[in-house]
From Swiss-Prot:
InterPro entries: ATP-grasp (IPR011761), ATP_grasp_subdomain_1 (IPR013815), D-Ala_lig_Van_CS (IPR000291), D_ala_D_ala (IPR005905), Dala_Dala_lig_C (IPR011095), Dala_Dala_lig_N (IPR011127), PreATP-grasp_dom_sf (IPR016185). Cell wall formation. Its cofactor is Mg(2+); Mn(2+). It comes from the Bacteria. The keyword Nucleotide-binding applies. The gene is ddl. Keywords: ATP-binding, Cell shape, Cell wall biogenesis/degradation, Cytoplasm, Ligase, Magnesium, Manganese, Metal-binding, Nucleotide-binding, Peptidoglycan synthesis. This is D-alanine--D-alanine ligase. Belongs to the D-alanine--D-alanine ligase family. Mg(2+) 2 binds at E260, N262. It catalyses: 2 D-alanine + ATP = D-alanyl-D-alanine + ADP + phosphate + H(+). GO terms for molecular function: ATP binding; D-alanine-D-alanine ligase activity; metal ion binding. Binds 2 magnesium or manganese ions per subunit. SUPFAM superfamilies: Glutathione synthetase ATP-binding domain-like, PreATP-grasp domain.
Length: 300
């Protein structure tokens, strides 16, 4: 099978995407597929460079990659691709929309408000949420332009920074607890990972630098494990996920809260999904093969 590994892109996460793409290529080649590296520098590259491939493995992140646009283009071209479809991808990229659906479905998530201008910040609403808060681009990823703000004085500057990366900014209550991630493969939860950043929170450096954080497989207490698994499965169902997705949570006082869903989890050597799969004996090559297999089974 001729597999095009699509990477690069036009988002702030381009370098992360290129790193993911290189790793994916290296291990897909072990499976004896014909691999075509497809580096995207501008949107129209997808139409041109994807011609002739049998399957697109998406190693993209951020806008025009994780937001449903590339998925829509590939469906128009009748090229099967890895991961979730356009609707789920678009919703999960929009943190505000994701949290509204989670709240409607009675899935725990931290309180938040969204703003689209530094001149129209509702400080009273933020007071109700309670400090400290995370200020971040609504549709960003990899914790780019994400800041932990401890009082009213720091809000405007953090909002202005985040608005450089997105037209909307999320201001979310900082729920202090243990950060965990649940990797879902074909609707089943792989072993849970605890994320212990060496910095104050799991920022860009902690995510991608060697030694930026400790990510370890953990055994949750039985009742908590059940709650976490039920919540991850509820997210999968309510947001109509397919193939694979990563559900990030915080556990506070024995109660899990969903932070966000990642529909194209990173595939670098430091990435969480391969670590979780490896804990049940699934090698990186086997994981990639499963993603291809399950993706081909999805009716688009």
């Amino acid at each position: 099978m001729k597999i095009g590994v699509i990477m690069g892109g036009i988002s702030t996460e381009r370098e992360v995407s290129l790193n993911s793409g290189r790793e994916v290529i290296k291990y897909l080649e072990l499976l004896e597929h014909e691999i075509i590296p497809i580096i995207i520098d501008k949107k129209e590259d997808v139409m041109e460079k994807a011609k002739g491939i049998d399957f697109a493995f998406l190693a993209l992140h951020g806008k025009f990659g994780e937001d449903g646009t590339v998925q829509s283009v590939l469906q128009t071209l009748d090229i099967p691709y890895s991961g979730c479809g356009p609707l789920t991808s678009a919703i999960c990229m929009d943190k505000d929309m994701t949290k509204k659906i989670l709240k409607y479905a009675n899935i725990n998530t931290a309180d938040w408000v969204n703003v689209s201008s530094a001149e129209n910040i509702d400080y009273e609403a933020i007071e109700k949420i309670g400090y400290p808060v995370f200020v971040k681009p609504n549709s960003g990823g990899s914790s780019v332009a994400t800041n932990l703000v401890k009082d009213k004085e720091g809000i405007k500057e953090a909002v202005e920074l985040a608005l450089k990366y997105d037209k909307e900014v999320m201001i979310e209550n900082y729920t202090k607890g243990e950060e965990i991630t649940c990797c879902m493969l074909n609707g089943k939860m792989l072993p849970v990972l605890a994320i212990r950043p060496h910095a104050e929170f799991f920022d860009y450096t902690a995510k991608y630098a060697d030694g930026g954080s400790d990510e370890v497989v953990i055994e949750l207490e039985e009742n908590l494990h059940k709650k976490v698994e039920e919540m991850a499965l509820a997210c999968w169902k309510e947001l109509k996920c397919e193939v694979y997705v990563r559900v990030d949570m915080i556990v506070k006082d024995g109660i899990p809260y969903v932070l966000e869903l990642n529909t194209l989890p990173g595939m670098t050597k430091n990435s969480l999904f391969p670590k979780s799969a490896n804990a049940v004996g699934i090698s990186f090559a086997e994981l990639l093969n499963s993603i291809v297999k399950y993706s081909l089974e999805v009716e688009r």
